[in-house]
Amino acid sequence: MTAAPDTPSDPLDLAEPGLKWGNSFARLGPGFYTELQPTPLPSPYWVGRSQALARELGLEDHWLESAEALEVLTGNRSTAGSRPLASVYSGHQFGVWAGQLGDGRAILLGDLQTPAGPQEIQLKGAGRTPYSRMGDGRAVLRSSIREFLASEAMHGLGIPTTRALCVTGSDAPVRREDIETAAVVTRTSPSFIRFGHFEHFSYSNQHDRLKTLADYVIDGFYPACREAKQPYAALLEAASERTARLMAAWQAIGFCHGVMNTDNMSILGLTIDYGPFQFLDAFDPGHICNHSDPQGRYAYNKQPNIAYWNLFCLGQALLPLIEDQEQALAALESYKTVFPQALEARMRDKLGLVETQAGDRELIESTFKLLASNKVDYTIFWRRLCGFTPQSGHESVRDLFFDRESFNAWALQYSERVAGVDQGVRANLMLKSNPKFVLRNHLGEEAIRAAKLKDFSGVNTLLGLLQAPFDEHPGHDSFSDFPPDWASSIEISCSS
């Protein structure tokens, strides 16, 4: 069954002429969601706005600065043509079947027709839904700023991700471990469908709806799968390949997600749901960024295997449609092929290895081992390495290591490998592959502390740096420096 195309709706009165709301997800039918209005956010104010994303969506810059936009993007005002809803899904959380979950505080307004195609607009923190369970449906300022900045930072790094148009705040109190204040993040994505959506309809034996959902995803996002002999196996294979490339991007940049439950896995291979994430400071393969994960299920070095485990769950959910277990397992094999290839390609770029040679994999592995044994700052190492030449003394890189003998041995190996490479070409490749700026925990924490005092300059400064993280940004070197000692005491959990 193919989802019916959207019928024209009234023009969106707050966008450029010709842009219209639709809601293709709503056409799946009421068994997939509950329609409801957002809960108004009292006395909202702007915290941060991505004008770059607004332009991509076809919105005028001045609109995102308007009082009207503030009301719409906090859920305080409805707009013609939008059809707010919360979707239902299930999932495995920390490896255990959690049953029915769903959008407990996120409300989809609809999809906006943009120059790049439809983009769903979702308000996170917009109030209780039938899927809130014991939650209050709100998000807090702290976690909302982190998600806003991380979404745009990952996009700036070229890593597939949902986006964030803005974050708005309110003085309305919200109880977590302490009393905090409410906020709403406006998220955008071609689709917010997760592995957990498929699990929900499969494990509740709603196989007709499972097929409807799979057909919707194939026809909307994986049309080439429709031509396959077994379209649903092809969908599993395509999702596996996208997820493999995403994991390669995470590992190469030093990103820890923190809570890779199946309901936090995008069917489109996007990074989604920024909670207790972290970009690595000192390189530690076993780093655990989530204080709520004491066993380290989602540690940095376990992410690739967890992604495969989650894909296996997706394969099980799709089995009623694929009907052949061996075919499903064969579709999953693409992950095992694509991930190491994609990771090696990214690491070659980071090392400036313009052409592939035998021994590159061994050089990559020795680099990781050297960084781990010396606990070297991951981002700073790679950025400084951009200036490494076989003829130089490499002092700025060597200074990062306490085991100078091991570094010297590695530097000799690396120098021999890049000796025949054009240094200008190599440096250019490396400068585009190794960012100067990432969203370190302490930078986010400083911006959050200021924002709690109604000073949003830190949020806006960070946003500008993170949207162009490979640029030098003169005068902002402090944002690319080593983290302060107190940064190691920051604890990030699932609380948001």
Curated annotation (Swiss-Prot):
GO terms for molecular function: AMPylase activity; ATP binding; magnesium ion binding. Its EC number is 2.7.7.-, 2.7.7.108. The active site is at D263. It catalyses: L-seryl-[protein] + ATP = 3-O-(5'-adenylyl)-L-seryl-[protein] + diphosphate; L-threonyl-[protein] + ATP = 3-O-(5'-adenylyl)-L-threonyl-[protein] + diphosphate; L-tyrosyl-[protein] + ATP = O-(5'-adenylyl)-L-tyrosyl-[protein] + diphosphate; L-histidyl-[protein] + UTP = N(tele)-(5'-uridylyl)-L-histidyl-[protein] + diphosphate. Pfam families: SelO. Belongs to the SELO family. This is Protein nucleotidyltransferase YdiU. The gene is ydiU.
